């Protein structure tokens, strides 16, 4: 997995210099970093029949089958949905139906991470993933999750539930609640105008700005709407929030999230 100029150049290096030699090993180590404690390499297990998935996650129900693929271009339908073909055989072999899957694709592996397509999966693949009940993730997503997990002190239960979702899995932790987008930036006063689309924002909340690689978290110390101080900015409002973001960071279209507290989850 190639990163941007500020990042290491391979996936094996990005996840805290793990020193592993294969993509599967790097993914396995990344999963352990976010708190999974029972990640098994299928090649090391005794199993009947032909080779199946690369990894298995046995931390809780359902068991997750993880298929890892590295490809030079964009993933084909076969590449992306292969893990779905392993579900029924494993259910039969293990005599249980609580088996899910995750397909982790290192697409455009020779391209720097920041230059890769953010939409590598076709509509057909996305539909199949939902219908067959497995998740789709890129190694760039996984890298971003691990990097921010380490930098921002996220907890395992902020990230692990993502792997049990079906369809496209974004690099957005579960304790982030979508607010809206940056629409304006007032450089002289250090204020961003956030168009609130979903979750309301209150003074005293913590919010996160999604940059190309990292998230920047901060407290909402002051909040304005229609040029006056308010306690809450609801959907539809252009909320003015004091920020430490630079002009380069506070670009139009940057996604903003409200950080849910433990008590409100």
What are these regions (language model features)?
Residues 1, 31, 110, 198, ...:
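Polar low-complexity intrinsically disordered regions
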Residues 1-12:
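Long, non-membrane, amphipathic alpha-helices that form coiled-coils
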Residues 10-171:
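Catalytic core segments in nucleotide and nucleic-acid processing enzymes
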């Amino acid at each position: 997995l190639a990163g941007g100029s500020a990042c290491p150049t391979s996936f094996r290096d990005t996840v805290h210099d793990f020193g592993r030699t294969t993509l599967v090993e790097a993914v396995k180590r990344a999963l352990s970093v976010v708190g999974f404690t029972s990640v098994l390499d299928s090649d090391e297990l005794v199993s009947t029949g032909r080779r199946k998935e690369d990894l298995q996650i046995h931390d809780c129900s359902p068991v997750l089958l993880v298929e890892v693929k590295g490809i030079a271009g964009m993933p084909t339908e076969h590449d992306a949905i292969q893990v779905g073909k392993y579900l029924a055989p494993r259910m039969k072999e293990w005599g249980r139906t609580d088996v899910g899957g995750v397909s982790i694709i290192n697409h455009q592996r020779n391209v720097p991470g920041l230059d890769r397509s953010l939409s590598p999966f076709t509509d057909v693949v996305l539909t199949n993933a939902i219908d067959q009940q497995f998740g789709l993730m890129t190694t760039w997503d996984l890298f971003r999750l691990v990097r921010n997990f380490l930098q921002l002190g996220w907890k395992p239960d902020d990230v692990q539930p993502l792997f049990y979702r079906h369809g496209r899995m974004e690099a957005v932790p579960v304790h982030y609640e979508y607010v809206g987008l940056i629409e304006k930036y007032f450089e002289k006063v250090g204020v961003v105008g956030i168009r609130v689309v979903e979750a309301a924002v209150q003074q005293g909340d913590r919010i996160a700005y999604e940059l190309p690689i990292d998230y920047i978290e901060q407290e909402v110390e002051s909040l304005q709407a229609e040029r006056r101080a308010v306690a809450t900015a609801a959907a539809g409002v252009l909320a003015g929030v004091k920020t430490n973001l630079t002009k380069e960071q506070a670009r139009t279209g940057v996604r903003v999230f409200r950080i849910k507290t433990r008590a409100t989850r």
